[in-house]
Regions:
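C-terminal cap of metal-dependent C-N hydrolases
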Residues: 15, 68-121
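His/Asp/Glu-enriched, well-ordered alpha-helical/loop segment
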Residues: 2-79
Length: 121
C-alpha cells in the first residue's frame, strides 16, 4: 500500500519495522491539528487554512479561493464538538488508527469537493 491507499489489516499486523508506513487520519487530522494549534497559535484557523489548503493549492497550481466562478472546495468544522474516534465507524477501508477510542474535540460536519457535497454528518 502506498500513495495514500488504505492497507489491509493483515498487512499492518506484522512487526513494526516491516509493516507498510502510515495510519488512517482523514477524520482525525483536523481535530488533532486544531487542538495543538489552539495552544500554540494566535489564530489557529488562519494557520490551518494556510498550511492545509492555501499552500498546498499553490504548490499544485490550483485556484482554490472561495470566489464566484470557482467550484466549492470547503468544509464546515465545529471546534467544540466532542466525539470518540472509532475505527469501526471510520469512513476508511483501513483499520489502523493511533486515535482509536480517544476523545476528540472538533469535528468536520460537511464537506464540498469540486462543487459537490461529498460528506455530511
Amino acid at each position: 500500500c502506498s500513495a495514500h491507499e488504505p492497507c489491509h489489516e493483515h498487512e499492518k499486523q506484522v512487526e513494526f519495522d516491516i509493516a507498510p508506513a502510515g495510519v488512517i487520519s482523514y477524520e482525525t487530522a483536523l481535530p488533532v491539528v486544531f487542538e495543538q494549534l489552539k495552544k500554540a497559535a494566535k489564530d489557529p484557523f488562519e494557520v490551518i487554512a494556510r498550511t492545509m489548503s492555501v499552500n498546498p493549492s499553490r504548490t499544485i497550481k490550483i485556484d482554490n479561493a472561495i470566489k464566484e466562478g470557482n467550484e466549492a472546495n470547503l468544509f464546515a468544522f465545529d471546534p467544540d464538538r466532542e466525539w470518540v474516534h472509532s475505527i469501526d465507524e471510520a469512513r476508511s477501508n483501513a483499520k489502523n488508527s493511533p486515535y482509536e477510542g480517544n476523545k476528540m474535540k472538533g469535528k468536520v460536519l460537511l464537506t464540498f469537493a469540486a462543487g459537490k457535497k461529498v460528506f455530511a454528518e
